[in-house]
Amino acid sequence: MGKTDYFERKLDDKRRLTIPTELRDELKSGVVITRGFGQYLHMYPKQVWDEMVEPKLDGDILDERIADLNVQFRTGKTEVELDDKQGRVTIEQHLLAYASIDRDIVVVGVGRYWRVMAK
């Protein structure tokens, strides 16, 4: 992960989150945003999603635990591109509603991904 493991932001009127400059290279391959396990979101670099999360979701289709993870992570999952000019990503309204996020947010690094939460 980059140097920044915590930041606070206000979403703009178009639901865009500005990413700190030092994290933008890590997210240039794209961003996957999905529901977390609690009332927050997960934000993954696309490469991390493809290499680490997606393979875990492709387990035994009869394994109830894997099925539950698929429902949790795929419900509302969005893939977005980082805006090159301003370094922003747009968060879909249904994900904001799930996490009870209005405008003020906190983003915390958790290993290779970030938790996005209401402030």
PLM regions with names:
Residues M1-R9, D13-K14, E22-Q86, Q93-K119:
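Flexible "stalk/tail and boundary" regions
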